[in-house]
Amino acid sequence: MTHVEMKQRLTPLYGEREAQAILRMVLEMRFGMSHADILCGKVTQLSADDTEELEKIIARLEKNEPVQYILGQSDFYGRQFHVTPAVLIPRPETEELCTWIKETAGQSSPKRAILDIGTGSGCIAVTLALELPGSQVEAWDISRDALLVAQQNAERLGATVKFVENDVQKVADPSMKWDIIVSNPPYITLQEKAEMEANVLAYEPHLALFAPNNDAMHFYRLISHYAARNLNDGGMVFFEINPLFSDGIKETLLSHGFTDIVVKSDTFGKQRFVRGTYTKDYLEGQKTADV
């Protein structure tokens, strides 16, 4: 099977450009080929066992299975993260969220306490631990399988992160204090299913995709409530959001006493991120004014 033949099989599904990118990823990451090797047609020189494995990979790709799950890894923030169907495949937009946090937090004390709620693969928590040295990073998820993947990523990449099986819908510990709380929670509604790619719907975990009870605001309310009680003075909450609900999320933060609320667009121009600041003096002033 030649490179051209493989591309011809995948192009109807993925388009020529993406099919070529996927094939290059497979040949480089799984079979150790360089771009020059691919151009020189060395795929035809693979051993019988490797050729059989490659054929199985192409067959899985023809069924729309994400190449990241097939290879067991995904690039995020210049690092390779292990991924399985127990976790979402990290998105480029989430890299932008990490950069925003890094740029904002870089102006504060290095001994900051960071909490990542709904960590999945651990891509946010691990990235922040590595990019903001000295930070104490904790990450929660309700899925044990996801936490195992996240722990593997932290160990392999040399990041110090405390992973905890925890549910923000039940947690209530006012003694835990944070400087930054970040979350990219499930926020997709059932009405948006028709617009989603088939491979996402078929293979990625619905628990991490779809908002419970079709309520896209569910986790934003819960996390805002928790953050308002567990952030240190001047602490911040960062969300990745469903652009359709940016106004509602902003209002939720306002109703929980957050100030300096910023809605930020991603590189595609969609309102994708929100940041709010908890200010103790502001809240006490509001209470005084109410009296």
Q: What are these model-predicted stretches?
A:
Residues 1-71:
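N-terminal auxiliary segments of SAM/dcSAM-dependent transferases
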Residues 131, 135, 140-284:
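S-adenosylmethionine
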Residues 33-34, 41, 65-66, 71, ...:
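Residue-level signal for pocket-adjacent positions within structured domains
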Residues 5, 9, 25, 53-56, ...:
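Alpha-helical elements of Rossmann-like donor-binding domains used by nucleotide-donor carbohydrate transfer enzymes
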Residues 42, 55-133, 137-152, 275:
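SAM-dependent Rossmann-like transferase core, predominantly class I methyltransferases
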Residues 50, 90-93, 219:
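An acidic site on a long C-lobe helix of protein kinase domains
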